[in-house]
């Protein structure tokens, strides 16, 4: 990486308004209930559950009976692993623990007396439990069967767990007992390894090896009746693989036929019924390799004939794109303006297809909808595919209406809203295929949007993402749940078969995951030179703050250090959550422009008590002001961008739906600070500011350019001197900063476009189209929100990228860069990261590197601290304490 020269700014600066909220989920550490993954209120428990799995050790097992067998149809065999799932909303026993077999069929419940002892420790993430039936089920008792429940806990909690089990009247058989070695516990006891460092790509190593053994993937040509564009060779091979996965009748991984039965080799489950084939998988090609066109080609086969192998193809056809049917004039109907002639699909064209099914549901973030529309217009013959936009207040509620279309486009947010709707047509519909675009969006299995997509009905399921792993292997669990790949779709099986062995350095975990991903996934990267992309360079531009900026920054950082150190010393960092997020936020904003942090937002509270907005209206006002300038924050419950924002009296911010579900508990507590919470403690945040895309930034202007703005202008003018027609993208996390940049850049003679999260989908699509229009010449600069532009859109018209402020998750920045460096890019791409010297931004870069190292060592044994989130130690580093 090359380092550019320093820039110095004018010394005369003034201050104006307001910051955005950030950093909302980074301190979530309170223990929450480990509830049913898809049928219970959402809690921020995934991270704690994952940590417990990775760091826990087998301390022994207890013998318990599985009861209620006559009420359930699930079959169970001897020496078979079973899934244990907490069921806190059970109307008969809130300590209930369900027992599931490998095929997700319920067998029964753990007997009440044992569940009463174990459930509280499961809910508090003190223990993780796994079950195994020790011997062949006897016919002498139809109502119960013994089960060994293996108890895992962190070393420091083992004494407490043992005493709790003993006080509950249970007998814990530990490793020191003679009977331990003679029991079935040895089947599941994990042998500790050395915690070898393994890169994320090792998961996909077996995928590459399989491809090499088979030779090149079998290529397929798309139906020319639908697809008018020529596919690259790797896209044709990808299409062939997709078709094979959908038509394959092979046994799923880890299943084999033996003595007339079907055996799962991991769990020892036997059945005389052949397991259903997996029709779908994970399409994990690198960002920018043309996955969307490949998927459209797959959909085209629903309309026209059998897949053909690779043959010389005709020239692309001319024509305009499909019409997109957005929504009906009134709720309940969506009229199509196209009359369509269809060819009937033979039943043998698609194995196992219900001939009444023809519709593919595509779920994506709002910013990606425009990319699908553009790809449809560019690559498909007009009038062939009928597309319905299921988004907005006037979307249809008629299932029969949706069945008329080939493609239904919707967003994760739309589906999350409909989770509780009994009459949701999307939930009623039996889809031919569901495609989750940017599928890493559901990496938190507890999130509302994750639960709802996993419940949808479809014959084929595809998880599509260029970043299948962002934090660690646990990100893949939610994909297994969506794909309904049993037994890995059951969390307890995933933990015992994959997660714990990986975390403890056991080679079995990695080999199982490699076999799994080799079977159901395809991943090709840009480094494999599948397409001739021009080179990309990354540079860092360090900016010196002006004397006035330096004086203010040093003063505020000094005050902030004292506040944070005091909170740490008093153990009250979590109780003053909003203070900490405000401190980090304001220091980062000062690095961009002092006007982002006006005088009224430059004071820090030093209280060590729980913050209460009812007694401090100024605190509520500051939180509201912070929200109004921002979009790059997540609800700490669902780990997703919040909808219908609620501020609690303890100064925490959540989605309305998430926090209202928390209030349904008998003794509701704030998920972050554990303070008591009632409905009267909730405050509605005001709606986001209206889209000001028609303004020129006058309302947000600063009287004098900041150091960073001056540096950016110098870089842009130098680029313009090299090539007057260069198009550039400037990314920032602060919407207010984008507005501030408009006036000086326009004054310098640049044509300005803006793309941020406050815009409607229609407006975003319009801006992206205008930026990519070759007729728009001259020096053009797109001011883009980092998060709103980070996925799914095509900005290949640009060749210069400026990251105006850094973000500690490097994957977010890489996703943004891949909007420019992807298929269709003809020019060399230069990306410049702008960093304020001697500031928190330099420490953010260090944190980025830490997270990159973690991504490259995702399967090493976990340390006691949480390495995937910004924790207390990270705060110490960011504040340079």
UniProtKB/Swiss-Prot annotation:
Return the Gene3D superfamilies for the record: 3.30.70.2330, P-loop containing nucleotide triphosphate hydrolases, Tandem AAA-ATPase domain, Zinc/RING finger domain, C3HC4 (zinc finger)
Keywords linked to the UniProt accession: Activator, ATP-binding, Chromatin regulator, Helicase, Hydrolase, Metal-binding, Nucleotide-binding, Nucleus, Transcription, Zinc, Zinc-finger
Query: In which residues is ATP bound?
Result: 285-292
Chain ranges for the short sequence motif DEAH box as given in the UniProt record: 437-440
GO terms, biological process: chromatin organization
Q: What class of enzyme is it?
A: hydrolase
Domain Helicase C-terminal, which positions?
711-876
Annotated PROSITE patterns: HELICASE_ATP_BIND_1, HELICASE_CTER, ZF_RING_1, ZF_RING_2
Recorded hits in InterPro entries, A to Z, give: Helicase_ATP-bd (IPR014001), Helicase_C-like (IPR001650), HIRAN (IPR014905), P-loop_NTPase (IPR027417), SNF2-like_sf (IPR038718), SNF2/RAD54-like_C (IPR049730), SNF2_N (IPR000330), SNF2_RAD54_helicase_TF (IPR050628)
Which SUPFAM superfamilies does UniProt cross-reference here? P-loop containing nucleoside triphosphate hydrolases, RING/U-box
Can you give the residue ranges of the Helicase ATP-binding domain? Answer: 272-486
Q: Where is this region: Disordered?
A: 308-343, 681-703
This protein's source sits in the domain of life called Eukaryota
What Gene Ontology terms describe what this protein does at the molecular function level?
ATP binding; helicase activity; hydrolase activity, acting on acid anhydrides, in phosphorus-containing anhydrides; nucleic acid binding; zinc ion binding
Q: Which GO terms describe its cellular component?
A: nucleus
List residue spans of RING-type Zn fingers. Answer: 635-674
Compartments annotated for it: namely:
Nucleus
Q: Which family does this protein fall into?
A: Belongs to the SNF2/RAD54 helicase family. RAD16 subfamily.
Tell me the function of this protein. Possesses intrinsic ATP-dependent nucleosome-remodeling activity. This activity may be required for transcriptional activation or repression of specific target promoters.
**PANTHER family hit by this protein:** HELICASE-LIKE TRANSCRIPTION FACTOR, TRANSCRIPTION TERMINATION FACTOR 2-RELATED
This chain's protein is named Putative SWI/SNF-related matrix-associated actin-dependent regulator of chromatin subfamily A member 3-like 1
Q: Which organism is it from?
A: Arabidopsis thaliana (Mouse-ear cress)
